[in-house]
Amino acid sequence: DISAVAKMLKLKIPVSVSREFSGDFDVFAFGGNSFDQDECAKAKNTAETCYGPRIGLAIMVLDPKKASSALRIWEKTMSSDLKPLILAKAGGSATANFQTGTYQSQSIRYKNMPINTITVEYALSDDILIITTSKSAILKAIDSLPAQSIQETTPATEPAQ
């Protein structure tokens, strides 16, 4: 049960998001790579936590449109709510708001932390929600998706403020 795992990891996932979870999920680890290690070296950060392992979640969702809308609203607190997934001392955010990027026609929402090897990122591909704590980890997770899951997606519109 993803709710039990979230509780065990001390993650705060809003009910508006978790009610869209189907129950099928995976927790995975990305071991880091030389790109991240080089980026940390440029920033004069030699701590292994700067470039080391990252934890991610892959969660099946019931209704991708509802999940997308709920995720956009969650962005306001997502970084702090998922802080236990970040295995490094990241400090505050480098960007005030989430931004959108694209990889293999897949829309990715992300928020950078002070070091660009540490982020909070998510992508919704068909009915699979991927949440990671580094750019490298989400790209690797997208590469691992079945080919039919990778399709051009349009992010939900910003909720009214």
PLM regions and their residue ranges:
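Short Gly/Thr-rich strand-loop-strand
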Residues: S68-V120, T153-Q161
